[in-house]
Amino acid sequence: AAKVTKAYIGIENNKPDAIKLMQEKATAYQGIEIVPLKVKYPQGGEKQLIDAVIRRQVPAPPAIPINVGAVVQNVGTAYAVYEAVQKNKPLFERIVTVTGKSVKNPSNFLTRMGTPMSQLIEMAGGMPEDTGKVIGGGPMMGKALSNTEVPICKGSSGVLLMNDKEASRAEAQPCIRCAKC
């Protein structure tokens, strides 16, 4: 229906082993290209990825990526679509990352929807004593959680456990748009 002839998989260039492995695997499929990406923020946003991978800019709204011939999917969504189309499997589980500097066993877990985040934290070695904040999602767009009994849902991607030092708020300073953050 979409008449797709080319697919790109973007991987940050600080992951050379992943890039090499994916390039080897991609040779078995016509029209798939692995694109090493600069490690920078923001890079994972839809518009930024389109610009970095195919050098097209999505105009201001109401324009959307399809207007420049692009569709962007994250790995979890792409995998869910594959399983639905190829295996007739409904979406009832996700891969969820549990990570953080103090986590004993940072891991990716294939997790059923509804599983409490607390169970994943236990599977990764338990709640570190120095935990200052628990974030559902990632460090930039995730949400701080006051309760780890929150269930995994289709939008869950990770649990980030920040230690006390990381969780402390830096003194507010005026933004001069230096891009250091």
PLM regions: where:
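N-terminal and secondary-structure boundary signal
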Residues: 1-3
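Short acidic beta-strand-loop surface patches of small beta-rich interaction domains
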Residues: 12, 102, 132-150
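Short polybasic amphipathic segments
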Residues: 94-98, 132-134, 157-159
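A structural-propensity feature for long, helix-poor, extended segments
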Residues: 143-171
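Cysteine-centered iron-sulfur cluster-binding motifs in ferredoxin-type domains/subunits
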Residues: 169-181
